[in-house]
Amino acid sequence: MNMNVREILENITKEHASDIFVVAGRPLTYKVSGKMHTYQEERMKPDMCRDFVTAIYELADHRDISQFETTGDDDFSFAIVGVSRFRVSTYKQRGSYSAVIRIITFTLPQPSELMIPDAVME
């Protein structure tokens, strides 16, 4: 997998995904409307996950990765101008770097998109 992480985040965000999952042994996966999709079929190797997670820290204004490396987990957020905001949870799973990335859009959805009844909106 060619890993331009910024480009991957942009592409997945355009798919209206809510979450991205980075786990060794699985393809890069994202969720759209409750359904899981793979970004590419190639399974991510531990070194690919390490590179992906490290790139996320660099995109997050070069956040210090040492806490994650010491404790095995970390939570933070960052934004890519013109793309979206992201809330990230990094952790080690079976010794490999892993992450769950929640995509937080810049705009709020319409109540109808959330299926909120009209009676509640009145």
Describe the residue ranges of each PLM region.
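N-terminal "pre-motor" subdomain/linker immediately upstream of P-loop NTPase catalytic cores
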Residues: 1-122
